């Protein structure tokens, strides 16, 4: 968490785009290859869920946008971490990056390890204090991040580079995202305070 907080303190280079690569502005592309499908409906419902939490008042900055265990190196003592592979980096909402990290690091199968989430948020807030607007949007942005990664897997393996072995690869992330969405409204707020 503290490494993510340190990253978010770095000024975003001007050349970075200001939206997530597979964010909400791309979700409508599902209509090109799977219109009126169950996945199209799922993605639309999640977009409707997150939309009220998207605000120009949410802080933006340099974000990694893909903090999964494959992009983090932890030393042998497990007291230091390095975030690597910045190919998805953009200037976007900090809380989106926190949500993506919850999906990518704190996800365990089809559930979230809330002890890991708590540790992540504590570490983050040693570097940057979350604003109330970010705390209140955290669950929705975790759903947003999960939806974006699920969309990437679905579109990549079913449309962009179809691969029958991976047609259903998105489903575990979809289930994890649904788990986050089904938590009580104050669950993430309590973890962040």
Protein language model features and the residues they cover:
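A cross-family kinase active-site recognition segment
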Residues: 1-38, 60, 170
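Short, mixed-charge aromatic SLiMs
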Residues: 26-34, 121-130, 167-185
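Short acidic/histidine-centered micro-motifs embedded in hydrophobic/aromatic stretches
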Residues: 45-46, 141
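Active-site acidic catalytic loop and adjacent metal/ATP-binding pocket
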Residues: 48-96
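Active-site activation/catalytic loop segments of kinase-like enzymes and analogous catalytic loops
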Residues: 95-129, 145-161
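All-alpha amphipathic helical-bundle segments outside canonical DNA-binding/catalytic cores
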Residues: 130-142
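ATP/Mg2+ or Mg2+-diphosphate-binding catalytic cores
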Residues: 149-193
């Amino acid at each position: 968490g503290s490494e993510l907080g340190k990253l978010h303190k770095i000024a975003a280079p001007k050349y970075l785009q200001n939206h997530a690569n597979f964010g909400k502005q791309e979700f409508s592309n599902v209509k090109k290859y799977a219109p009126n499908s169950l996945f199209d409906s799922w993605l639309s419902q999640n977009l409707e869920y997150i939309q009220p939490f998207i605000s120009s008042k949410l802080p933006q900055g340099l974000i990694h946008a893909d903090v999964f265990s494959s992009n983090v190196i932890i030393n042998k003592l497990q007291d230091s971490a390095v975030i690597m592979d910045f190919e998805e980096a953009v200037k976007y909402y900090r809380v989106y990056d926190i949500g993506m990290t919850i999906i990518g690091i704190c996800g365990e199968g089809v559930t979230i390890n809330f002890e890991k989430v708590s540790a992540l948020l504590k570490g983050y807030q040693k570097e940057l204090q979350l604003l109330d607007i970010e705390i209140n949007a955290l669950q929705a942005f975790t759903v947003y991040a999960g939806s974006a990664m699920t969309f990437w897997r679905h579109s990549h393996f079913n449309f962009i580079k179809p691969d029958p072995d991976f047609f259903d690869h998105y489903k575990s992330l979809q289930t994890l995202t649904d788990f986050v969405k089904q938590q009580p409204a104050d669950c993430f707020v309590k973890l962040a305070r």
